[in-house]
UniProtKB/Swiss-Prot annotation:
Family: Belongs to the thiamine-phosphate synthase family.
InterPro entries listed in its UniProt record: Aldolase_TIM, ThiamineP_synth_sf, ThiamineP_synth_TenI, TMP_synthase
Gene that this sequence comes from: thiE
UniProt name for this protein: Thiamine-phosphate synthase
Any one GO molecular function term: thiamine-phosphate diphosphorylase activity
């Protein structure tokens, strides 16, 4: 094993497998009631620009998810590692979208799984008891229940409004959130969310709002983030 430093923390790297084992301080138990903005990165091919766009936003969010549907494996690894170093400096957990192998390799704090990705139980076994594992559940309560049984830390519902980024045939409603208060894990709302339309979503019980373009594509992303936060009274 050899030791490398990411941010101000040590991590152990297995020379044979290349798998990173985070220092225990890096993976903490999921906060009991996370509430606020769950920021998801855009499809950005310039790593330096991605970091520059993301850094000013970290102090105002709960979690960061790395998502880039256009990048190849090498670029995804480069960007994920750069974001992880940034997140280590601020204490914000970094999750990887749809790539359990990448999450494990770089020692990310968790992974978000879609419909055709790995089972949450596999992710839990590979990433450990404190990893944050999320599952897209669209508008399906039964899928959410099964995901939680399999080890999911949170479930995502959406889309709530039309979205250019998150295109699915599924449409979720505030009523769905009211029907899932018993699930016992945070519920993430996603899809076309803006500061002007999120009040009903928050009132219905969503603990977290997943946002991409509403913040990154705004004229002033920091101001946009504050507008979202104001709806949570945070």
């Amino acid at each position: 094993m050899e030791v490398s430093r990411i941010g101000s923390f040590q991590e152990h790297i297995d020379k044979t497998t290349g798998i990173v084992t985070p220092h225990p301080l890096l993976r903490k138990p999921l906060m009991s009631q996370p509430r606020g903005i769950y920021l998801i990165t855009p499809d950005e091919t310039d790593t330096a620009r991605l970091i520059a766009r993301t850094a000013p936003l970290l102090n105002g969010i709960v979690w960061l998810q790395y998502r880039n549907k256009l990048a190849n494996t090498a670029l995804r690894t480069e960007q994920a590692q750069a974001l992880l170093a940034l997140c280590r400096q601020t204490g914000i957990p970094l999750l990887i979208n749809d790539d359990l192998e990448l999450a494990q390799t770089i020692g990310a704090d968790g992974v978000h799984l879609g419909m055709h990705d790995s089972n949450p139980s596999i992710a839990r076994a590979q990433l450990g008891p404190h990893a944050i594992i999320g599952v897209s559940c669209y508008n399906q309560i039964e899928r959410a229940k099964q995901a939680i049984k399999a080890g999911a830390s949170y479930v995502g519902f959406g889309t709530f409004y039309p979205s250019h980024t998150k295109t699915t045939p599924y449409r979720a409603t505030p009523e769905l959130l009211r029907q899932t208060t018993h699930l016992g894990v945070p519920r993430v709302a996603i899809g076309g969310l803006t500061p002007k339309n999120i009040a009903p979503i928050i009132e219905a019980g969503a603990e977290l709002l997943a946002v991409i373009s509403g913040i990154y594509s705004a004229k002033n992303p920091v101001t946009a983030l504050k507008a979202y936060q104001s709806q949570f009274n945070i």
